[in-house]
C-alpha cells in the first residue's frame, strides 16, 4: 500500500500529471463512480475532493439541479417546472413523479441525487495484462504528419484487440526509438 489515504494518493497523481504533462486535473474520490464524478466537478482547477455516500446531503444537495451528472437542459427545464431547483430538491421528490415526467431517466436522476449507483468502484485490481503493438519503419519519420498515421494505425490495432478481449486500457504508453 503505497499511500496512507486515497486523498494523499490522488494529490500525488494530480501533482505528477502537472509535473510531467503541464496540465491540471481534478480528482474525485468516492466508493461510487457517480459520486467520484460529481466530486471531480466541485471546484476547479487542480483540486482533489471526496464525496462519499454519507457526505451527499451536505456537499451535493445544495448544488443547482443542472450540476447533477446526466441532468441535461431538457430534464432541468422539466424539473424546474416541478419546482425542483437543487439536487436536494430532486433527492427528496417522489421518484414516481419523476418517472411520470421524465420516464426511466427521472428514476436514474433521483438515484444519482441520492448517491445511489450500482456501478461501485472496484478496490481490487485485476492482474494487469499488456496489449501492445509495434512496428519498424523502413525510414525514420521526421514530421508529425508522417508519424500520426502510423500511431493511429497502431492504436486502432490495439483498440480492436482490447475490444475483442472485453478489456479497457488502464494506461497508454508510446515508445519512439530513433538513430
Q: Can you name each region flagged by the protein language model?
A:
Residues 1-101, 105-108, 160:
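Gly/Gly-Pro- and Ser/Thr-rich, intrinsically disordered tail segments characteristic of DNA damage-repair
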Residues 75, 80-179:
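DNA-contacting surface of Y-family translesion DNA polymerases
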Amino acid at each position: 500500500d503505497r499511500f496512507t489515504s486515497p486523498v494523499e494518493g490522488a494529490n500525488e497523481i494530480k501533482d505528477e500529471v502537472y509535473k510531467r504533462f503541464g496540465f491540471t486535473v481534478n480528482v474525485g474520490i468516492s466508493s461510487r463512480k457517480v459520486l467520484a464524478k460529481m466530486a471531480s466537478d466541485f471546484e476547479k482547477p487542480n483540486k482533489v475532493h471526496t464525496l462519499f455516500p454519507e457526505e451527499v446531503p451536505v456537499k451535493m444537495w445544495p448544488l443547482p439541479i443542472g450540476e447533477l451528472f446526466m441532468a441535461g437542459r431538457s430534464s432541468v427545464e422539466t424539473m424546474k417546472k416541478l419546482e425542483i431547483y437543487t439536487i436536494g430538491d430532486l433527492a427528496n421528490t417522489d421518484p414516481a413523479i419523476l418517472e411520470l415526467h421524465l420516464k426511466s431517466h427521472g428514476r436514474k436522476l433521483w438515484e444519482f441525487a441520492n448517491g445511489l449507483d450500482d456501478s461501485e468502484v472496484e478496490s481490487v485490481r485485476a492482474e494487469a495484462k499488456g496489449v501492445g503493438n509495434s512496428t519498424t519503419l523502413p525510414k525514420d519519420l521526421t514530421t508529425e504528419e508522417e508519424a500520426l498515421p502510423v500511431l493511429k494505425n497502431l492504436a486502432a490495432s490495439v483498440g480492436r484487440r482490447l475490444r475483442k478481449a472485453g478489456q479497457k486500457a488502464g494506461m497508454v504508453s508510446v515508445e519512439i526509438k530513433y538513430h
